[in-house]
């Protein structure tokens, strides 16, 4: 056997960090992948790169490889490592080779530790009305399975029935313990995180825990006052428009906003004065009478003043 120069195979230096080595591995793996590369030795080069990555991507295994590389010219190393057949070992033989050269204690000390699985995040769309009460939801996602090189080898479909609590907010994260990818060497599974996305509503805008709704009113309703029916998340209510209301005025309806464990928000009705269509002759005459009666009123009196 002969000890390969894994750093040369990857085109990196022994002092390079894992990020640099990982970048080199991905580049070479794409270059020599048998399904992509046209080079005659692509398959052999791909296996060689994968073998180098398996060793250099593991901190303990890389340290042991560096130690073996430093001793490659020592007589004792040559007696135990070389068999004269000119073949190189692969990463699967690494434990046995290292322990035969440096002793059983070294092998025991490099046992790979238990590693926690990866977390997974998925976005869950929730309608505003659904935030008022706890509800059940069936979610589906793909559980990635990683190979020895840290790359996704396959994805396994998975379905869960979950409870979405009342009062969830936009961007809130819900943890489902142990529903992520499996751990390695007895390590715990990762978690699944549900990231809540409140779907846009055709009527309501969210402002913190409060809701805003634009309420169209006629000029005479704004001037004289009125009672208009306004929807909320639960039911419709009768909203009082005070006389002399202005466009853009906000009327507060207490306790009709979003509900959470800590507080209940309010609903703000934002008035929008809507003019009727182009008036006929009789209607125009009435508008003119109103204009004459309010001739002293100048809506632009303070316009542009600090």
UniProtKB/Swiss-Prot annotation:
Compartments where located: Cytoplasm, Nucleoid
Domain (J): residue spans on this chain: 5-69
Give GO terms for biological process: chaperone cofactor-dependent protein refolding; protein refolding
> Which GO CC annotations does the UniProt entry carry?
bacterial nucleoid; cytoplasm
Q: Which domain of life is it from?
A: Bacteria
Q: Which Gene3D superfamilies match?
A: DnaJ domain, Single helix bin, Urease metallochaperone UreE, N-terminal domain
Query: What turns on expression?
Result: In late stationary phase, by phosphate-starvation conditions.
- Miscellaneous notes: It binds to curved DNA in a sequence-nonspecific fashion.
UniProt name for this protein: Curved DNA-binding protein
């Amino acid at each position: 056997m002969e000890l390969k120069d894994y750093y040369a195979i990857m085109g990196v230096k022994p002092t390079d960090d894992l990020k640099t080595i990982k970048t080199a591995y991905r580049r070479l793996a794409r270059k020599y992948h048998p399904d992509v590369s046209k080079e005659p030795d692509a398959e052999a080069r791909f296996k060689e790169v994968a073998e180098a990555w398996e060793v250099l991507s593991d901190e303990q295994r890389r340290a042991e490889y560096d130690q073996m590389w430093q001793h490659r010219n020592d007589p004792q190393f040559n007696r135990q490592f070389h068999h004269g057949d000119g073949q190189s070992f692969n990463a699967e033989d690494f434990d046995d080779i290292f322990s035969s050269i440096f002793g059983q204690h070294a092998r025991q000390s490099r046992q790979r530790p238990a590693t926690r699985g990866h977390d997974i995040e998925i976005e869950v769309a929730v309608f505003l009305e659904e935030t008022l009460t706890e509800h059940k939801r069936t979610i589906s996602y793909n559980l990635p399975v990683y190979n020895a090189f840290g790359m996704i080898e396959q994805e396994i479909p998975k379905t869960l029935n979950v409870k979405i609590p009342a009062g969830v907010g936009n961007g809130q994260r819900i943890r489902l313990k142990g529903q992520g990818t499996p751990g390695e060497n007895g390590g715990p599974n990762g978690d699944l995180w549900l990231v809540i996305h409140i779907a846009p509503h055709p009527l309501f805008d969210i402002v913190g825990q409060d809701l805003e709704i634009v309420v169209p009113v006629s000029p005479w309703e704004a001037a004289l006052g009125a009672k208009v029916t306004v929807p909320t998340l639960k039911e419709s209510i009768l909203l009082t428009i005070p006389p002399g209301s202005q466009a853009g005025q906000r009327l507060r309806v207490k306790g009709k906003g979003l509900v959470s464990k800590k507080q209940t928000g309010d609903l703000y009705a934002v008035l929008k004065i809507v003019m009727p269509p182009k008036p006929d002759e009789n209607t125009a005459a009435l508008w003119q009478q109103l204009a004459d009666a309010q001739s002293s009123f100048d809506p632009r009196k303070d316009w542009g003043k600090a």
